[in-house]
């Protein structure tokens, strides 16, 4: 068995004498593990840093085996992630959440989303918005997508300003006004892609964090990661007026 694909390094752990098990989010084969011989060496360390995109050739005798990876660099992002603390914390959080994807289940759209986010993550003005969009995309990939295009109460597509914490559906201003204190704000940029103010990004992270916690993490006995909290703190500092 053999194939070649693009992959984003999610994590690495030592295996035996000098080898490493590498976890990739591949473009066509989803989250996939493989052994890299000599992967624990200093020579291989720069290539195997989480966040890098690699060209991966996987070989195994049978498809169900873990198999071996031969990796070549495609996009090296180590310097960017080290230079921007919010980006490093953000990708750590993303990798931890991506680990919840079923192994070898294709998610090409999510692969493209993660790659695009990593390429723009250093930009402090867009980092918070990008993380919220990632969490929204991940919820959809896991079967818990939010419905933000029409009002749950009226079916209208206009004046969508709230989200119900129970249904995960948008609610228009008129229908939601009596219950506003029990609803989440719906930031416009999650619907129309416009550039948001910082307050809208905070609202978006509050929204996606709630559904990530209640629909994905808590049923698995997990909570929101420390890396996510560290990202939000670092991002807030990065955009604060000097």
Curated annotation (Swiss-Prot):
GO terms for biological process: DNA recombination; double-strand break repair. Keywords: DNA damage, DNA recombination, DNA repair. Pfam families: RecO_C (PF02565), RecO_N (PF11967). The keyword Secreted does not apply. SUPFAM superfamilies: ArfGap/RecO-like zinc finger, Nucleic acid-binding proteins. This is DNA repair protein RecO. It comes from Xanthobacter autotrophicus (strain ATCC BAA-1158 / Py2). The keyword Transmembrane helix does not apply. One of its GO terms (cellular component) is bacterial nucleoid. It comes from the Bacteria. Gene3D superfamilies: Nucleic acid-binding proteins (2.40.50.140), Recombination protein O, C-terminal domain (1.20.1440.120). Belongs to the RecO family. Involved in DNA repair and RecF pathway recombination.
């Amino acid at each position: 068995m053999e194939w070649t694909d693009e992959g984003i390094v999610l994590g690495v752990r030592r295996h035996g004498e000098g080898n490493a098990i590498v976890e990739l989010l591949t473009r066509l084969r989803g989250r996939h593990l493989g052994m890299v011989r000599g992967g624990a060496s200093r020579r291989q360390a720069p290539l195997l840093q989480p966040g890098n995109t690699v060209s991966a050739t996987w070989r195994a005798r049978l498809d169900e085996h873990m198999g071996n990876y031969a990796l070549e660099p495609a996009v090296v992002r180590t310097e960017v992630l080290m230079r921007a603390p919010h980006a490093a914390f953000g990708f750590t959080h993303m990798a931890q959440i991506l680990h919840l994807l079923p192994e070898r289940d294709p998610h090409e759209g999510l692969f493209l989303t993660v790659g695009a986010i990593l390429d723009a993550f250093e930009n402090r003005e867009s980092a918070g918005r990008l993380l919220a969009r990632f969490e929204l995309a991940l919820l959809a990939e896991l079967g818990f997508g939010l419905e933000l295009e029409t009002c749950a109460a009226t079916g209208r597509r206009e004046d969508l300003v709230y989200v119900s914490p129970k249904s995960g559906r948008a609610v228009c201003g008129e229908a939601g006004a009596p219950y506003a204190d029990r609803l989440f704000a719906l930031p416009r940029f999650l619907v129309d892609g416009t550039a948001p103010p910082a307050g809208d990004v905070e609202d978006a992270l509050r929204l996606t964090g709630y559904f990530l916690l209640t629909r994905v993490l808590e049923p698995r006995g997990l909570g929101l990661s420390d890396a996510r909290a560290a990202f939000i703190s670092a991002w807030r500092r990065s955009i604060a007026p000097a």
